[in-house]
Amino acid sequence: LFALGVRDRVFSILLWYIWACLFGRNPLISNPGLPYVGLLLFVHTFLPSAPYGSFDRRKEPDPNNGWRLPQELFVVVWILMAVGYTYSGYTKLISPSWVDGDAFAYVLNSPLARPSFARDILLWMPTSIIHLLTWGALAAEILFLPLSLFSRSRPMIWFNMLMMHLGLIMLINFADLSLGMVMLHLFTFNPAWVKRKESPQVDRVFYDGYCGLCHHAVRFLLAEDARDNANIAFRFAPLQSDLFVAAIPQDERAKLPDSMVVLTGDGETLLRSSAWLRILDRLGGVWRVLSIALRLVPRVVLDWGYDLVASVRGRLFKKQEDACPILPKELRARFDY
């Protein structure tokens, strides 16, 4: 229920209490991620209610309603994460295995190590490389706090530590040790680090006005592109609108899918996965990161997945009676007919 967004602030308190009761369940292993998971649950109780995508927001006319993560909470979590990393690195200076550079080798040879090709490659490497990896991780922890004070080095050190934890999840058969830290990093990701793809003109998103999935997609874009009207990335119009007929020549319209079509500001018509990759690029932040990752997948595979979802959307989502989603007046101003 918490993950679905049903009374999420109430359930976050309950989960925080349960988490606190289980904190010392394994005294043999010190897990630095557990306190941070508790911190995230506690912080969640102070977030504004009903963000976009939550169950409690599903029937609200405004998909976003001005929801924003309070800057104060974001800064507090960042400070605690930075202090925790640097303190953790400082305490490792009294450990001979970290000072000598052997700590990573001990991890790879421990019973917790996950048998894998990546582990075999690391064990095959010269001892000097293992030492450098150990000292590099130690230096990253110690320097996390000072580097996080500067806007240019902050995303770099954040990314380095995230990659370290993802690597440990791959190498160690005990994901709990790093999974909590990965969750912390996701919370502290700043969308401003990944700029949206700029365009001098607004893109037009044409959608099937009677498709339930398309309506959900439009509401998602309205929530994520919640900028002032002078700086928006998208305007919207149904495929059934006069604007679509005027914007796309008849011979070209006959070849287009009846789902979503993006007409860029420079007149390019994008379909299927190409349209959504463009949309994700224009949103910026984590969505542009997703776009970059999806570009590693062959386009034919992405288009196949798009067509598969489009073929079953009518059975999965209720048909809409109104071509324009039910929205507040200021959001309806972003629709053309």
Model-derived regions: residue spans:
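Extended, low-polarity transmembrane helix blocks
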Residues: L1-S97, T127-R204
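Short, positively charged
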Residues: P63-G66, R119-L122, R235-L243
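Short, acidic, Ser/Thr-enriched surface-loop or helix-capping motifs
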Residues: T86, D208, T264-G265
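Solvent-exposed, well-ordered loop and adjacent helix/strand elements within mature globular domains
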Residues: K92-L133
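Local sequence-structure signature of Cys/Sec-based thiol-disulfide redox active-site neighborhoods
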Residues: E198-E224
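Conserved helix-turn-beta segment immediately C-terminal to the redox Cys motif
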Residues: L222-F236
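Thiol/selenol-based redox catalytic cores and closely related redox-interacting motifs
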Residues: L239-Y337
